[in-house]
Design a protein with these regions (language model features):
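Short, motif-level signal for alpha-helix interfacial/capping segments enriched in acidic residues
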Residues: 301-305, 420, 425-426
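ATP/Mg2+ or Mg2+-diphosphate-binding catalytic cores
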Residues: 394-420, 430-467
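Conserved catalytic-loop position in the HRD/HxD motif
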Residues: 324
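An alpha-helical support segment within catalytic cores of ATP-dependent transferases
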Residues: 80-88, 273-319
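Charge-rich, acidic-biased intrinsically disordered regions
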Residues: 248-267, 289-292, 296, 422-436, ...
Length: 467
């Protein structure tokens, strides 16, 4: 069943529910939708994913790339890179916000998209492209998919099957533990905070050039992991920018249409954030309140920053990107990283998610994620470190600068060696600051609506960029 939900605010969303009938006698799930009668038998309409026979049917249809004769508009596909597949078992991985994941044979994961769009899902498009065209190994391998055909060109993606990646959790939790150890080292090693060196923000720095005081404090392993993640990020972008035939993926230049689209989108988003901060100002206190007032006082300067985008000065190229790239979208497997969930920004329309963007936008998202990891450790665990919170913030900013510099060196070095055109140094820095500001303003709306105490993090990020 495809459902259109209309909201009072004059917009709508589409959802997908696979529905089955179970008689009262065989009912073994609490996912009831409504009572029903079929051929005189009383029972209930239920979510079909909770019936193993239905999960098995999905698997077998994907494995055979076979259509259902009763529903010829449902397109099942299996990757040509895979051999025969036989159903053995299935279980739920756990419900998520916009999809439900089913683990098959402890080997594959079928992601059922609950929130759907009248278009193919970017996660399906990019995952299949990276697997079948690029042979990119550091993303879950594309196994198969389920799409609904609703016209000559329009398909709706309702399922994406991928190979299960054995892992030790996501990079967000991994780096949170690392950061906690780093800050614990301050007291453990009796480090004098004024002795911690700093570096210019966005300045690329080789591992061997990071000051020994930083390595002694944060550890070599942290920066080796940062560099490994930077390498995988660069390889992802090189792969996404490598095609010369598929128009959905061929790199393209900046142009006037993109500039108009970008400015319209960001000025609308910025006005939305201004309204949000004005309506939620009473929820803030202390430094968050002070920074929010500075934000409001400098709103015209921020708006000018967003409007200060001249495509004629940019020589780099745009490609399809991840679009919502942060530490939570990365799995850790021992000493390596796997990149996943290419759906794009949740607030964006499906059309906007497919617009080719500067790859640096993904890097800005990852930098904001590192900033969050540092600040969340201080905000949640700061009382256990023998320093004032403001002192920890200063130390954290210095660490953040070295993390960004180390990441950027590895990333830029790899993409330039592999002929992905991201521009020269000044253009990279302009795009990075522009995208960092966009990301931080985007985050601000989320924090104000859901956890105002954390609004401090994007507010500090915004003012850091402005200053």
């Amino acid at each position: 069943v495809l459902i259109e939900v209309n909201f009072q605010e004059a917009f709508f969303q589409n959802y997908f529910i696979p529905v089955a009938f179970m008689s009262e006698a065989e009912l073994d799930t609490n996912t009831l939708i409504a009572p029903a009668q079929f051929n005189g038998v009383s029972g209930y309409l239920v979510d079909a994913l909770h019936i193993e026979d239905f999960r098995k049917l999905l698997f077998e249809r994907i494995a055979a790339s076979a259509e259902l004769r009763e529903f010829p508009h449902i397109i099942f596909h299996k990757s040509s890179l895979l051999g025969p597949m036989k159903y053995e078992s299935s279980r739920f991985m756990g419900a998520e916000q916009s999809n439900t994941s089913i683990v098959y044979n402890e080997t594959y994961v079928l992601k059922i998209f609950r929130r759907i769009y009248i278009s193919t899902n970017p996660d399906y498009e990019i995952n299949r492209f990276l697997t079948e065209v690029c042979r990119f190994e550091n993303t879950p391998e594309y196994v198969g998919s389920v799409n609904l055909s609703i016209g000559e060109e329009d398909n709706i993606t309702i399922g994406l099957m991928q190979r299960l990646i054995p892992n030790q959790g996501d990079a967000w939790n991994y780096f949170l533990k690392e950061m906690d150890e780093v800050f614990a080292n301050l007291g453990r090693k009796k480090i004098k905070l004024s002795d911690i060196p700093d570096t210019e923000h966005y300045k690329r720095i080789r591992l061997q050039n990071i000051p020994h005081q930083i390595i002694d404090w944060a550890g070599l392993n942290l920066f080796q992991k940062v560099q490994q993640l930077a390498l995988r990020s660069a390889q992802m972008h090189v792969a996404l920018g490598s095609d010369t035939r598929n128009t959905s993926f061929v790199p393209t230049n900046f142009n006037g249409d993109y500039e108009v689209w970008l400015k319209n989108r960001l000025t609308y988003q910025f006005q939305n954030r201004l309204n949000t901060i004005e309506n939620n100002l009473h929820k803030l206190e202390g430094e968050s309140m002070e920074l929010a007032k500075v934000f409001l006082n400098r709103k015209n300067e921020i708006r000018r920053r967003f409007l200060d985008f001249d495509w004629t000065k940019l020589k780099s190229e745009r490609i399809r990107i991840h679009g919502d790239y942060h530490l939570g979208q990365v799995l850790v497997d021992h000493d390596d990283f796997y990149l996943l969930d290419f759906e794009g920004e949740p607030e964006s329309t499906i059309r906007d998610r497919k617009v080719k963007q500067p790859p640096i936008k993904d890097i800005a998202g990852m930098f904001r994620s590192f900033h969050y990891a540092i600040y969340s450790v201080i905000l949640n665990n700061g009382s256990k470190f023998p320093y004032e919170r403001d002192e920890l913030f200063v130390a954290g900013e210095k660490l953040y600068h070295f993390i960004c510099g180390s990441f950027l060196h590895t990333y830029v070095d790899h993409v330039q060696k592999n002929n992905l055109n991201i521009g020269y140094t000044k253009e990279i820095e302009f795009l990075l600051q522009y995208c960092l500001l966009e990301k931080a303003v985007y985050e601000l709306g989320y924090e104000l609506n859901s956890r105002p105490r954390w609004a401090l993090i994007p507010l500090r990020g915004i003012l850091q960029i402005l200053n």
